[in-house]
Amino acid sequence: MSFVSRCLAAAAIAALVILAGCAAPGVHAPERRPEDVRAEIVRLLPNGAKDREGWAADIASAFDVLDIDESTSNLCAALAVIGQESNFVADPAVPGLGRIARAEIDRRAEQHHVPGFVVAAALTVHSSNGKSYGDRIAAVRTERELSLVYEDLIARVPLGRQLFSDANPVHTGGPMQVSVAFAEDHAREHAYPYPVDASVRREVFTRRGGIYFGVAHLLAYPADYDRMIYRFADYNAGFYASRNAAFQSALAIASGRRLALDGDLIAYDDGSAPGATELAVRSLSRELKVSDPEIRRALEKGESAGFEQTDVYQRVFARAQKMAHRKLRRALIPEIALKSPKITRKLTTEWFARRVDQRYAECLARAGAGVH
């Protein structure tokens, strides 16, 4: 392929990504037959994905029960996240997970001033399957396996309850690495469509459950984004984090204060003291003609679409755009460093979003000439 041809091909894919990203997940095209949706997913799956029919069935089912438009753009968005998070392995292995888990136990023991010999003795106790907890933890390869060990440890050993306060420290799992807390909250508000194996937590680690909750987290909320990459950033950083980061950028212009563009509009520690973003808005209360309580109420809508309708949001952008003499972007990828015992190098939300966006572009390219 010539240089010119390569440039034209790259430009075509870029245009396809932009056009696809403009589609709103909740806007439905004419209804498609389920078998047609499954067939398209099979075609869109990357080379090397095993059990293509099974993946297609679970993905199509999630879109159906969540009532999300099965557009090529939306399907590719889900496939891109699955590819990035698990490479289409329902219960992906985590390198060195046993070592990571033992280090976390030791860290928590130190926090609670529990001597090391007490921890070592507790881990020699035989678990429900006859093996010691220490042996089971050393042998775990996946988060599902580790979650089950922690469930057992918390239920049967007093030290487990002391260290983990009845809260399983495995927070994400499954093929889309979705948050267990999000899944449990979602299941309380919406009927889970499949039979539950003991708990919603365990469903997260299944292919069908992980896809269902992951697709809900990615696409089942309204967001006025012009590119899908901002949903990928939100998937990593939280609902509307990209919109909120753009608001913080506008607020920095309007207030003259330096702000972290992390998408967090209020302080999430104990929630009582105002954070930097709230203080910056308060500094403009006279100019914006809003009171401190009004500011707080507006910022508390930061995880909903309704924040955009508040006086705070609209007046901050109006002031910032007047000062900047230009129209400001309404979405920015949040500037967040990713932290987890599983992460061994410097990663950010931007790194995640761009990696997923590249997979999304590749999926759209596989789709061919058009986006349904």
Give, region by region, the residue ranges found by the protein language model.
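Cell-wall glycan-active module
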Residues: 1-6, 17-372
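Sec-dependent signal peptide hydrophobic core
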Residues: 8-12
